[in-house]
Design a protein with these regions (language model features):
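S-adenosyl-L-methionine
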Residues: 14-47
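A short SAM/SAH-binding and catalytic strip from SAM-dependent methyltransferases
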Residues: 39, 45-66
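Class I S-adenosyl-L-methionine
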Residues: 94, 98-147
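Conserved SAM/SAH-binding beta-strand->alpha-helix loop
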Residues: 7
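Conserved class I S-adenosyl-L-methionine
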Residues: 57-62, 86-105
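Short beta-strand element of Class I
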Residues: 1-4
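A short glycine-rich, Lys/Arg-flanked "PGG" loop and its adjoining helix->strand segment in the class I
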Residues: 65-84
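Short alpha-helix immediately C-terminal to the canonical SAM-binding loop
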Residues: 10-13, 95
Length: 147
């Protein structure tokens, strides 16, 4: 597992959590998605998880969204044949934007949920962030995108 995080403080918390849980199959990279091609060979990733990435709600910050077509084109070569990008977010507008971006970039969408915790979807690994917002009654949006 490769965890990519641009915020050093968040990355340190993730490293500490992995140590606390005794996880030894995780590598950590402090940086942004633009750096991934330097570290990841083509056709080597089965799944990319975009869990609660920043929605950058201002239109002027759209280029920073991890589901912006610019980033989707970075991820494409890394995915194995049949590989998927799985996204979870609590932000409806970001989710709608993501659906549009994935579609424009040739991805096929599946397992779309507008309220993950009420959907009966099995196999969800709940993040701390997800637990927090779900417990406050916010729906969690989820999708899988494949080429």
């Amino acid at each position: 597992i490769l965890c990519v995080e641009r915020n050093r403080n968040v990355l340190i918390m993730a490293i500490d959590k992995a140590r606390e849980l005794g996880l030894d199959n995780i590598m950590f990279l402090c940086g942004t998605a633009e750096y991934l091609p330097s570290y990841i060979p083509n056709s080597s990733i089965e799944e990319i998880y975009l869990n609660f990435s920043c929605p950058f709600p201002k239109k002027s910050h759209e280029a920073h969204r991890l589901t912006n077509p610019r980033f989707l084109e970075i991820y494409k070569p890394m995915l194995k044949n049949g590989g998927a990008i799985c996204q979870k977010t609590d932000n409806m507008h970001f989710f709608e934007y993501s659906i549009e971006s994935f579609s424009k970039c040739g991805f096929k969408l599946s397992n779309i949920s507008l309220d993950l915790h009420k959907s009966g979807f099995e196999g969800n690994i709940e993040t701390e962030y997800e637990q927090k917002f779900s417990s406050q009654g916010f729906p969690i949006y989820r999708l899988e995108a494949r080429l």
